[in-house]
């Protein structure tokens, strides 16, 4: 069994949190952040059981500034 660390990107939609794993492409949701991450972990594990792990490159996350008219 192989253990890997993946990225979870979360955002809130109305009364749910949506969680996405950009490296694998899995998405799930939950009523709390913890539930969304747990559901994403389960979805990702199921996906990796069925499909070979893709060639994964580390995700680089940063911030940037944008000027716009408000």
Language model region names:
Residues 1-5, 9, 38-70:
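Short, charged, surface-exposed hinge/linker loops at domain edges
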Residues 4, 9-23:
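Short aromatic-glycine-(Arg/Gly/Cys) micro-motifs in beta-strand/loop hairpins
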Residues 16-17, 34, 46:
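Intrinsically disordered, low-complexity segments enriched in polar/charged small residues
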Residues 20, 37-38:
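Short, surface-exposed helix/turn micro-motifs that flank interaction/cofactor sites
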Residues 24-33:
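A short, exposed loop/beta-hairpin motif centered on an aromatic-Gly-Thr core
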């Amino acid at each position: 069994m192989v253990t890997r660390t993946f990225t979870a990107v979360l955002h809130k939609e109305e009364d749910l949190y949506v969680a996405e794993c950009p490296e694998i492409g899995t998405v799930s949701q939950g009523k709390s952040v913890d539930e969304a991450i747990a559901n994403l972990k389960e979805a990702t594990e199921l996906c990796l059981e069925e499909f070979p792990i893709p060639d994964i490159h580390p995700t680089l996350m940063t911030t940037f500034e944008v000027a716009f008219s408000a």
